[in-house]
Amino acid sequence: MATPRPCADGPCCSHPSAVLGVQQTLEEMDFERGIWSAALNGDLGRVKHLIQKAEDPSQPDSAGYTALHYASRNGHYAVCQFLLESGAKCDAQTHGGATALHRASYCGHTEIARLLLSHGSNPRVVDDDGMTSLHKAAERGHGDICSLLLQHSPALKAIRDRKARLACDLLPCNSDLRDLLSS
């Protein structure tokens, strides 16, 4: 535990420098109070409360991530479903071009990927590295998601990233997915 620093009036907990290493930036405080933290933590009640207070479900944080990106990455299905039903843009992109489908695919959340696709998410969207959601799923060896994405868009197999790699080129060694992703 951090030790309080003495102030002119003695030990003082409320002084900004009272506790070493326990300071938050305004940006961090905005994140904690905003919809992003609630989505990240799967706090559906808080997400609903913030949406009812007219918070935009597609409002990005300072890094360009929306609540749907955070909920998708962390596997919070109910939060994703509520955000989509509340008008969240399923193909909103971060500063690096990632969509919620990229995040769900990379993290192995098949049911969330299915939910996003059912709400119109485009699996052919590429991030700044030229990677599709199929590249992201293949990179981590998520076979169920690879199959799901190919059902929606078989042409994904032929898309190369900026380094000219196909999704099958990113498979982990000894992957059973090579046959699925190779033409």
From Swiss-Prot:
Domain of life: Eukaryota
ANK repeat locations: 30-59, 63-92, 96-125, 129-158
Keywords: ANK repeat, Phosphoprotein, Repeat
Residues of the signal peptide: none
InterPro entries: Ankyrin_rpt (IPR002110), Ankyrin_rpt-contain_sf (IPR036770)
Keyword Protein biosynthesis recorded: no
Pfam family for this entry, one: Ank_2
Modified residues (Phosphoserine): 153
Family to which the UniProt record says this protein belongs: Belongs to the ANKRD39 family.
Listed name of the protein: Ankyrin repeat domain-containing protein 39
